[in-house]
Amino acid sequence: MKNTPTQLEPNVPVTRSHSMGFVILISCAAGLGGLLYGYDTAVISGAIGFLKDLYSLSPFMEGLVISSIMIGGVVGVGISGFLSDRFGRRKILMTAALLFAISAIVSALSQDVSTLIIARIIGGLGIGMGSSLSVTYITEAAPPAIRGSLSSLYQLFTILGISATYFINLAVQRSGTYEWGVHTGWRWMLAYGMVPSVIFFLVLLVVPESPRWLAKAGKTNEALKILTRINGETVAKEELKNIENSLKIEQMGSLSQLFKPGLRKALVIGILLALFNQVIGMNAITYYGPEIFKMMGFGQNAGFVTTCIVGVVEVIFTVIAVLLIDKVGRKKLMSIGSAFMAIFMILIGTSFYFELTSGIMMIVLILGFVAAFCVSVGPITWIMISEIFPNHLRARAAGIATIFLWGANWAIGQFVPMMIDSFGLAYTFWIFAVINILCFLFVVTICPETKNKSLEEIEKLWIK
């Protein structure tokens, strides 16, 4: 392909607008990986009610159908760092898209719950690989001043995928009788997963490899071409020097460095960010939204419609986060967001306890929690996990943190039905409230601020 960005001459003058357009292009391309994550996160919320009736699922099996994709996700994240360091970020992202496409086809055609679970594990493998590498790719290409906003594109595309899928679920649910939904409708919900996977794969065909990975692989000229297109020739040469200096450190180190004083703190922060992102309650609403709304007294159709409203709020406040992250800062947004999330969870649990769930106020409380999450912990977790680790350990270290993220994701998907069945909705949401309070304390006391810092400057926070 003669016109791909990787084939630009390094001595071509680069304007700020031209450079910015290129940066946004490659960031959006990688961010599309979030569509896969978002689609699968939301699609199962529409399908699970039909699957429960079709296969007479117990709370444990209901959780397993939902959480099975996280099993593959843990494996995918675990191997993504090694594979991407060896073969490049772009090739592994393309592999992730293919795995998800296979999963969508097999899931839609499955004739028993075992096949469905296996198919979802395959899809999880692809999503796990993509979830850590998409943000890593953007982080390694973006200029420091706008890196946070561009890295949050992954979360934005995730939310767009979630929101669009809620509307797809609603459209499918309205396409036939409930009986049709039990036997056929859920298959269409899962089959449409082919669309984001194909889009992701095709877009990756026309974007370049990560300049930092190219420099690491000894392809200095190619790395300089891409950096020149991003920053202009003068800045590109300086950036390349910084990359090469950090890569020299890699030759003297190993993954064991992460467990030494200094970097060990970075690893702990990355892991805790990942855990809090998953266990503060957002995924419970995402995975079980229609079912929770039915428990509040909503009918089948009303539950799907209300979930669509949740999706719209997610999109709006994620866009707001993209605009604020590099202006307000990561730490401030997360501290404010986690405080509000704790308040909303306390009020939601109290409403369930006193059975005050039939009015508009309950929906407002849930939407308030969703908004607080999407403007803070939701997008910032992915950004900071990709920022806080040294260049020579970033992919593998981010992979470790994301393994914990997917492990926590699995636990929520698996055990929330059992928690609701055993404790009821009130105590379940109060548990999430306590976790949000812990998240607030963690952000305020431990998390660093990385706004407007280069990756090399962030590395110096740990290596003193």
From Swiss-Prot:
Annotated membrane topology: Multi-pass membrane protein
Keywords: Cell membrane, Membrane, Sugar transport, Symport, Transmembrane, Transmembrane helix, Transport
Amino-acid biosynthesis as UniProt keyword: no
Localization annotation: Cell membrane
Induction: Transcription is repressed by the binding of AraR to the promoter. L-arabinose acts as an inducer by inhibiting the binding of AraR to the DNA, thus allowing expression of the gene.
GO biological process, one term: D-glucose transmembrane transport
GO CC, any one term: membrane
Signal peptide (from-to): none
Disruption outcome: Deletion of the gene does not affect growth on glucose, but the mutant cannot grow in the presence of arabinose. Deletion has a negative effect on the ability of the mutant to grow on alpha-1,5-arabinobiose. AraE/araN double mutant is unable to grow in the presence of alpha-1,5-arabinobiose.
GO molecular function: D-glucose transmembrane transporter activity; symporter activity
Alphabetical list of Pfam families matching this protein: Sugar_tr
Primary site of residence: membrane
Family listed: Belongs to the major facilitator superfamily. Sugar transporter (TC 2.A.1.1) family.
Protein name, UniProt field: Arabinose-proton symporter
Organism, scientific name: Bacillus subtilis (strain 168)
